[in-house]
Amino acid sequence: MGRRKSKRKPPPKKKMTGTLETQFTCPFCNHEKSCDVKMDRARNTGVISCTVCLEEFQTPITYLSEPVDVYSDWIDACEAANQ
């Protein structure tokens, strides 16, 4: 008689090691990585500004917000203004 087969644990899943971007492409002048985001958690505001064309946008944030959320709000506001 043989031994019973042992069950193996599945290999552990790999965690996401990448980080989210903090520099973005400006929708006005189209320069890559020219927009920097500053998150002011004390005042609950996020400010994104372009270093080339000096365009600036400010939006309210929450404790869960990330720089990409501020950028997406800016893009949404630009699209809403165009319509």
UniProtKB/Swiss-Prot annotation:
Which residue spans traverse the membrane? none
**Keyword terms of this UniProt record:** Chromosome, DNA damage, DNA repair, Nucleus, Zinc
Q: Which GO terms describe its cellular component?
A: chromosome; nucleus; transcription elongation factor complex
- Chain residues that bind Zn(2+): 26, 29, 50, 53
Where in the cell? Nucleus; Chromosome
Is-annotated flag, keyword rRNA-binding? no
Please give the Gene3D superfamilies that the UniProt record associates with this protein: 2.20.25.190
Cysteines joined through disulfide linkages: none
Reading the lineage from the top rank, the first entry is: Eukaryota
GO MF annotations, alphabetized: protein-macromolecule adaptor activity; RNA polymerase II complex binding; zinc ion binding
One GO biological process term is:
transcription elongation by RNA polymerase II
Q: What is the effect of changing residue 55 to A?
A: Does not affect transcription-coupled nucleotide excision repair (TC-NER)
What SUPFAM superfamilies would the database entry show? Zinc beta-ribbon (SSF57783)
Q: Partners and quaternary state?
A: Associates with RNA polymerase II.
> What does the function comment of this entry state?
Factor involved in transcription-coupled nucleotide excision repair (TC-NER), a mechanism that rapidly removes RNA polymerase II-blocking lesions from the transcribed strand of active genes. Acts as a key adapter required to anchor TC-NER factors to RNA polymerase II: stably positions UVSSA and the DCX(ERCC8) complex (also named CSA complex) on arrested RNA polymerase II, leading to neddylation and activation of the DCX(ERCC8) complex and ubiquitination of RNA polymerase II.
For this chain, the family text in UniProt reads:
Belongs to the ELOF1 family.
Query: Under which name does UniProt file this protein?
Result: Transcription elongation factor 1 homolog
